[in-house]
UniProtKB/Swiss-Prot annotation:
InterPro entries: Ald_DH/histidinol_DH, Ald_DH_C, Ald_DH_N, Aldehyde_DH_dom, G-glutamylP_reductase_CS, Glu-5-SA_DH, GPR_dom
Organism of derivation: Nitrobacter hamburgensis (strain DSM 10229 / NCIMB 13809 / X14)
Biological role: Catalyzes the NADPH-dependent reduction of L-glutamate 5-phosphate into L-glutamate 5-semialdehyde and phosphate. The product spontaneously undergoes cyclization to form 1-pyrroline-5-carboxylate.
Gene: proA
Subcellular location field: Cytoplasm
Protein name per its UniProtKB record: Gamma-glutamyl phosphate reductase
Pfam families linked: Aldedh
Length: 430
């Protein structure tokens, strides 16, 4: 940020500050759109090194954020999303290196054809321009979003939650160092330098054409606000009410492993399972072992009458439970009459995010994968694979559940659009 913008920030003239950030980002986007793959990769290498070198400073900043969150009564799941460890910092740096290793989508010719008049037409991937990422508690989003936007030739404006402000600032310094070492404009990755919540509203306004797309990463209230108020396109999912359906033809050992991982690996992530559906035909063999396993692992189970009958520790499920993204060690559980009723339940209560079936019956699996209208559907795998890194995208800037432009994990390629290049030899239209 320039000295003039720092002065503006100090004077609390937020609209001027935000428009200045957007203007600088737009200028940086023009440079990035023409930057070579080698130059972008040089910056990513330097960013990864800087993150590792600054681990102590990042952890110290994060410890202050976590202490404030705990003092404010944050849930354990919220604190988990906010907390950084040495292992998570290493994973963050590794994630930047993975993005460096993926193919550069910019300039990729996806189609080429020749017309009868001799003209050659090419469809070519180009950056979107300026991306605004609005997120809450996860500071690693800074590195993921910064790396992906850089690789895809986009400038990015990052607006982290006030809870992660110090952590994001420490990580952002590493990203800027990488840009500087590669000779790229520092405004290519901008962190909004204030906790003022009014900054979100200004980003949603589009900043007079300064923002091309917005990606929210956070809870339902944030995403709902972004989708309701944004004046520019949004890549988002409102919530992750994800299901695991255990079919009557499921292998019990596999089902137990998948259900436990889908719920308890990290209960607060958007790919965590929130509802367990069990086929009535297999319930005599599968239901009690699954429920016992979850409760013994520290997960609260809220079930229908059939689920309550197998374990006195199960709490009664209410109608609201089927529509709830807990983001915690809680799961709703229900017995259904086969895959048809499971699909119907998911269509009524799901969020079109991620849903899984566990079965050894290929026909049942095919029906589930075809009929469940979610961005990600899985057969015999945990819902926690709903992640751009696990898809080979390097990382993700978010998960989109809409049906326009991007759906599922939004990686570098999904952060590009296209244009048509037409080569002629003097043709004129009759």
């Amino acid at each position: 940020m320039t000295a003039s913008l720092k002065a503006t920030c100090a004077s609390a003239d937020l609209p001027v500050l935000m428009n200045g950030l957007a203007t600088q980002a737009r200028s940086a986007a023009r440079v990035l759109g023409l930057a070579s793959t080698a130059q972008k990769d040089q910056a990513l290498d330097a960013m990864a090194r800087a993150i590792r070198a600054a681990a102590a400073a990042i952890l110290n900043a994060n410890a202050e954020d976590v202490a404030d969150a705990r003092a404010g009564g944050a849930t354990s799941a919220f604190v988990d999303r906010l907390t950084l460890t040495q292992a998570r910092i290493d994973a963050m740096a590794d994630g930047v290196k993975v993005v460096r290793a993926i193919d550069d989508p910019v300039g990729k010719v996806t189609e080429r054809w020749q017309r009868p008049n001799g003209m050659t037409i090419e469809r070519v991937r180009v950056p979107l321009g300026v991306v605004a990422v609005i997120f809450e508690s996860r500071p690693n989003v800074c590195a993921d979003a910064g790396a992906l936007c850089l690789k895809s030739g986009n400038a990015v404006i990052l607006r982290g939650g006030s809870d992660s402000f110090r952590s994001c600032r420490a990580i952002h310094e590493c990203l800027v160092q990488g840009l500087r070492e590669a000779g790229l404009p520092e405004a290519a990755i901008t962190l909004v330098p204030t906790r003022d919540r009014a900054a979100v509203g200004l980003l949603l306004s589009g900043l007079d054409g300064g923002i091309d797309v917005i990606v929210p990463r956070g809870g339902k209230s944030l995403v709902a606000r972004v989708e309701a108020e944004a004046r520019v396109p949004v890549f988002a999912h409102l919530e992750g009410v994800n299901h695991v359906y255990v079919d009557g033809a499921a292998d019990l050992a596999m089902a137990k492993a998948i259900v436990l991982n889908a719920k308890m690996r990290r209960p607060g992530v958007c790919g965590a399972a929130e509802t367990l559906l069990v086929d009535r035909a297999g319930a005599p063999n599968t239901l009690k072992p699954l429920v016992d396993m979850l409760i013994d692992a520290g997960c609260e189970v809220r079930g229908d009458a059939a689920v309550q009958a197998v374990d006195a520790r199960v709490k009664p499920a209410t109608d609201d439970d089927w529509d709830t993204e807990y983001e915690d060690a809680i799961i709703a559980a229900r017995v259904v009459d086969g895959v048809g009723e499971a699909i119907d339940h998911i269509q009524r209560h799901g969020s079109h995010h991620t849903d899984a079936i566990v079965t050894d019956d290929s026909n049942t699996a095919a029906r589930f994968l075809d009929e469940v209208d979610s961005a990600i559907v899985l057969h015999n795998a945990s819902t926690q694979f709903a992640d751009g890194g696990e898809f080979g995208f390097g990382a993700e800037i978010g998960i989109a559940t809409g049906k326009f432009h991007a759906r599922g994990p939004v990686g570098a390629e999904q952060l590009t659009s296209f244009k048509y290049r037409v080569h002629g030899t003097g043709q004129t239209r009759p």
